[in-house]
């Protein structure tokens, strides 16, 4: 009788010792893609103003959002509020800017202009329609009070992100 129990006990011991952990992995790719369509250029219509608007000789940057699945993402687009490169400035720069819908792949996306939320220098838009939206960003920098910007290279940056809800 003992001889029959020994193999059974050994079998249970070996079964417990042979346990394994099996990993499960996965990669998630965003269903929202952000692409730069056009870089911006500052025009200098007056000595104290730098502007990306076409009327002022500039070029507005354009960012495209491609949304594969609607209602899961929001766009966060920041307009510049500082130069990342410039000559030394000894006075205040007053910044303004806006984010507007340019082109759309679905007419319902034109509502994004009315539904956006603004805080600090950030525009937040719920991406409620699948497809592509092109956002134009305007930026103006006004230097001091009747002061001319010093000659040199000026650079600022627009940040565009797609955030999962």
Please place each PLM-identified region on the residue numbering.
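Gram-negative bacterial Sec-dependent N-terminal signal peptides
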Residues: 1-19
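N-terminal regions of proteins, emphasizing targeting and processing segments when present
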Residues: 10-13, 81, 105-108, 126
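Intrinsically disordered, low-complexity serine/threonine-rich segments
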Residues: 16-17, 99, 108, 113
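N-terminal small/polar-rich segments of proteins
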Residues: 18-94, 124-165
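Short, surface-exposed beta-strand/strand-loop-strand elements in extracellular ectodomains
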Residues: 93-104
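Extended, solvent-exposed segments with strong compositional bias
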Residues: 107-128
